[in-house]
Amino acid sequence: MKPVFKMLLSLLILWTSLLHAQVRIQITQGVDSARPIAVVPFKWLGTVEPPEKIADIISSDLRNSGKFNPIDPSRMPEKPFTASELITSSWYGLGVDAVVVGQIQAGADNHYLISYQLVELSSGTVLTQNQYKVTQQWLRYAAHSASDEIFQKLTGIKGAFSTRIAYVVQKNTRQLPYELKISDYDGYNPFVVYRSSQPLMSPAWSPDGQKLAYVNFESGRSALVIQNLASGSIQKIANFQGHNGAPAFSPDGAKLAFALSKTGSLNIYMMDLASGNITQITDSRSNNTEPSWFPDSRYLAYTSDQAGRPQVYKIDISGHGVPQRITWNAKQNQNSAVSPDGTFLILVNSKDGQQHIAKQDLKTGDVQILTDTLLDETPSIAPNTTMVIYSSTQNANSVLQLVSTDGRFKALLPEVDGQVKFPAWSPYL
């Protein structure tokens, strides 16, 4: 079992009593145009009802990717549990070219054995298969892992279903209304990382998934902190007079970029995490904020209003050269996130009175508007670059939304108990 997931499981158990509303994905657009696939209900080898429906989890994962449309079990001509039982000819006419079969077996000491096979219908070939022996708490993780493997085999893209999201919830209560939460990417297994009577903002994952940087106001003004998720210990990074915000870990894990206004103007700074030394990156009278790292950990994208309105710029952290403006498409561009492969930006594009999430190709400069929701902000990209999570306004509430990076698939993640903001997608865990 991976160390980071042992740590997350311990936190999950610790905070079980604090679980309240859960984010749940609701598909809003894009399923009908996706690739049909069949995920046959898994055979259950046990004496009571299974604790989790593994096939349902895999189906949901594949559907949530926007690339697959699992058919309803009622349309399946048969329900085999192994590839050898599958009659490929019976599936012709459904538009399905791959079938997932499997079973879950109850064992001793609260352990379960999950097995699955992905079968190509045209040849009857088993494309991939695996087994997982897990305790009940890890059943969903095993299902997400199977989804990752199936997704990668069928698309060539590494799956991100076993990743997590961090986000801030402002609850409708007077006592400790602000919560920093982590959940599975699909909203299951949420737990509270930190509670406060004061606002919490801008969570950012370390590249190893073991820490979160964020902004709190415990001292009466903004402060940047890093919290170790295993121990719960909190390290204060910056608590200067004025604004302290917008933390971003470098991909190599050695540096943290952030924005400070300690000298009056809002500028980008960087801390070497080993030494604690802080270096100023931008130096101007304009507002410079929202840093996002390029994959090489040498360059930053950031938002600046040096041209009058917010636009996105690129800067070399070594101090060589001058900042380069990289957005020109709209009146305002901000809240940029550089894709993990460095090929595109996801940002908030403001044009013609609309504020939407957009994708800009960093080679061609082409811009595609991805969303049609209201007051979109703070986008965060999945580590496999296929999906974006962001916050928007719906019925006067702040909610989380998903959109695929091709713009074809959209989903809503409603939180029933409060305003949900500042989503941050984890790295691979």
UniProtKB/Swiss-Prot annotation:
Localization per Swiss-Prot or TrEMBL: Periplasm
Gene3D superfamilies: TolB, C-terminal domain (2.120.10.30), TolB, N-terminal domain (3.40.50.10070)
GO biological process: cell division; protein import
Any single Gene Ontology cellular-component annotation: periplasmic space
Subunit record text: The Tol-Pal system is composed of five core proteins: the inner membrane proteins TolA, TolQ and TolR, the periplasmic protein TolB and the outer membrane protein Pal. They form a network linking the inner and outer membranes and the peptidoglycan layer.
Similarity comment: family membership: Belongs to the TolB family.
Name under which the protein is recorded: Tol-Pal system protein TolB
Species per Swiss-Prot/TrEMBL record: Hamiltonella defensa subsp. Acyrthosiphon pisum (strain 5AT)
